[in-house]
Amino acid sequence: MAGDSRNEPMFCEEGSSESGYVLCVIDSLKKKITSDRFVYIQKRVEENSIKLSPITLHSHNLSKNRQTSTSNSTDLVSNLLTKRKEDALCAVNSRESSPDESEGANCQDECSSTVIVGGNLSARNSVRPIRLPEVATLPPYTTWIFLDRNQRMQEDQSVLGRRRIYYDTNCGEALICSDSEDEAVEDEEEKKEFKDSEDCIIRMTIQECGMSDAVLETLARDIERAPDDIKARYEILQGEKPEGSSKKVSELNVKMEDVYGDKDLDAALDSFDNLFCRRCLVFDCKLHGCSQDLVFPTEKQAPLCSSDEGTPCGIHCYKLVSKPDAIMEIDSHLLVDVEEPTSDNLKDQIGSNKKKLGSSGQKTKSQQSESSSTARVSSESSESEVQLLSNKSPQHSPGLSKNKLGAKGGIKKSTNRRIAERILMSVKKGQQEMSPDSNSIVNGCHWPRDMKLRSDTRSGIKDSVVSSQCNSPSTRSFRKKGTLQMENNSSFVDAQSDSMEDTNNEHSATDGCDSSRKEECVDESICRQEAHGRSWKVIEQGLLLKGLEIFGKNSCLIARNLLGGMKTCTDVFQYMNYIENSSASGALSGVDSLVKGYMKGNELRTRSRFVRRRGRVRRLKYTWKTAGYHFIRKRITERKDQPCRQYTPCGCQSACGKQCPCLTNGTCCEKYCGCPKMCKNRFRGCHCAKSQCRSRQCPCFAADRECDPDVCRNCWVGCGDGTLGVPNQRGDNYECRNMKLLLKQQQRVLLGRSDVSGWGAFLKNSVGKHEYLGEYTGELISHKEADKRGKIYDRENSSFLFNLNNEYVLDAYRMGDKLKFANHSPDPNCYAKVIMVAGDHRVGIFAKERISAGEELFYDYRYEPDRAPAWARKPEGPGAKDDAQPSTGRAKKLAH
């Protein structure tokens, strides 16, 4: 049967329509699947029967042997069932009776309080039960998740539209909490999963008949699915092919770097923009969620400048390659024999140099060629080549010393500088042509201590050389000092100048050759820089743009923070030099022009800041009234218990007007908004001195806000010893005391049995009045969600809801911290306060009075009068004031 079904051809008559042909194919597939299923089941039944036969045979033999042994045995004890029946607990077969009624009554009383064990025994065993002392049960405890910061409720945790079931302790059963039948949720249709047989029919039918609307509709009618579902299922089945799957994964891993390399920075950061929270600076923020609206600030911060610019960042730092250390080493080797000459051997050296003047010309030519090659090698910008320069220079230094000392005195002092320039002209000129930005390099780097000059003559010559390259104020001071030092050694330098004038003709003969070689070096350097610039990918250029925007022209910080593993510090420095060199010829385009624009913009911005600092400081009159907008001042002065407004950053690209979302919502613009700092609606922080932020004179404290180090002038946070570029720590007198929630400087709170009700929160250490104890954390839910959850909380006689602002309520039932167990009291020792911290409203618990260690914490829940439970209502008195607002929902805690 199975064989006939397999060999049955899947075709129909030629005259049948397309739908009939599809039905014919489906029927044939069903028959084939049914026959295969029948064969498979029959085969499994046979296999299971073979496996089961030894087990059943063994059990049958055991039962037969047991029955034989029981029938042959005459001992009644062997009958286990009879023995257990006779020895059953509390079974009494014989009991002594007494004619005396009083004794019978006593016996009954005794038997009622005892348990008799054993029936056919000669003596009865009685056990008197012992009553255990009653122990108070633990109060109800809810399993909860600890939260150190608030978290927005997940969508699947909502109770809206769901049946709420609670346990009623009075009747001892679970009940459904529902106000009306409308809240009953209809049962959702179970999603049918595709079976293996259906997958086979879909795959084989589409492969046989093709994918068309008629085929999909026919399959949908036969399988009772939607055509779109069938089409999606077929695509899934096609994608689940194991063939070549491992090869595809390996190809994806190999090409992953190339895929990101071809994209620009915005495309590569698309997913990061959705996941990264720019307010909390974390990924997958639980408070603000993902896919936030991107707000681009109008004003950007100035680039970060590193204070330790002279220290190399690593072995690939440009400071170890591009600064003229190799030139300084050449200078030291060239002048090693000239250092500190004496008057005794000076005449001998002059005489010997006059005799060897003829041979010195050839040596000078070789020296000039070596110097030109040295200049070409020094432009390679690598550490190994710098070491080669230091090894080559001592070989030709004796010849130079002999040529320099064979001349007479009598030349003017002004020739000293010209002598030094002639000695190193071939080295310096090539270096200047190939690196036009050497001035900025020298100015931005500090000379090493081991390169200090050890004599007056050497310092004078080297200072004159440096003066030809850089014009900084420090270089000018060295130039003046070097001139005075060279005046003291004028006789020695005059002799040097005569020898140089004698060999001037030989030098001029080699200048033409040197200039041609220098031009070749420049051309090679330019070609190398162009090839280096073309090797940069689009994403690397985008990261460089972002690095210039953040760190300025600091190659070390850009390579370390943004281009790690892609480009080194030297690569970044050379690419920026290539951009500057190419900008002069106007050959820039695309990203290169943007890089040049950012580099110029940073220079102009830094220059303008420097000019402003030189001017007179303008002191503005700053009071607490200028800190925020008028509605904030109105709330500060009137101290009305108005609900706080939820803050949402605005994306205004200019000064906010009447259409600003912050202005229409009734909130101030914060640092997260896109508007400039001069916006009139922006909260400007405080200018309090030292620790004066805990009084109402502080605008932040008066507006129920914490100070922000980015906004307030004197309220900042310092850490470390200043080595990382941040200010040092100050004493306690300079610490701002209005940043407790921001810095999480809470007290230690313990959890224990409360003397009032259930569990309670206790303080570990003593604190003073108005000290910050901790934060009341929980889930951020809507007011509608809070009303739904509050029905259960009210019936369970518990309260974990806390009003936060006009949009959210804090619920600490499932998630929170230990302060959720602080009980209510009409005469509390703590108080709750809603404070805005970095744009978010948070609830802080503060000490209302001095609290000793181990004391339980209480605060007034401040329930609304018509919603407060009986245990939380204040006793009515003749002088009681009702200052609460009418309620619109379930019982929720309120802050002061």
Curated annotation (Swiss-Prot):
Region (Disordered) location: 344-419, 459-514, 869-896
This protein's UniProt keywords: Chromatin regulator, Developmental protein, Differentiation, Flowering, Methyltransferase, S-adenosyl-L-methionine, Transcription, Transcription regulation, Transferase
Signal peptide (from-to): none
Record field: transmembrane: none
SMART domains: CXC (SM01114), SET (SM00317)
GO MF, any single term: histone H3K27 trimethyltransferase activity
Residue stretches of biased makeup (Polar residues): 391-400, 465-476, 485-498
Expression sites by tissue: Widely expressed. Highly expressed in young panicle.
Catalytic activity: L-lysyl(27)-[histone H3] + 3 S-adenosyl-L-methionine = N(6),N(6),N(6)-trimethyl-L-lysyl(27)-[histone H3] + 3 S-adenosyl-L-homocysteine + 3 H(+)
Start-end of Basic and acidic residues biased regions: 504-514, 869-884
CXC domain: residues covered: 633-732
SUPFAM superfamilies in UniProt: SET domain
Residues annotated as binding S-adenosyl-L-methionine: Y861
InterPro entries, per database record: CXC_dom, EZH1/2-like, Hist-Lys_N-MeTrfase_plant, Pre-SET_CXC, SET_dom, SET_dom_sf, Tesmin/TSO1-like_CXC
EC numbers on record: 2.1.1.356
Subunit structure: Interacts with FIE1. Component of the polycomb repressive complex 2 (PRC2), composed of the core PRC2 components FIE2, EMF2B and EZ1. PRC2 methylates 'Lys-27' residues of histone H3 (H3K27me3), leading to transcriptional repression of the affected target gene.
PANTHER family: HISTONE-LYSINE N-METHYLTRANSFERASE E(Z) (PTHR45747:SF4)
Protein name: Histone-lysine N-methyltransferase CLF
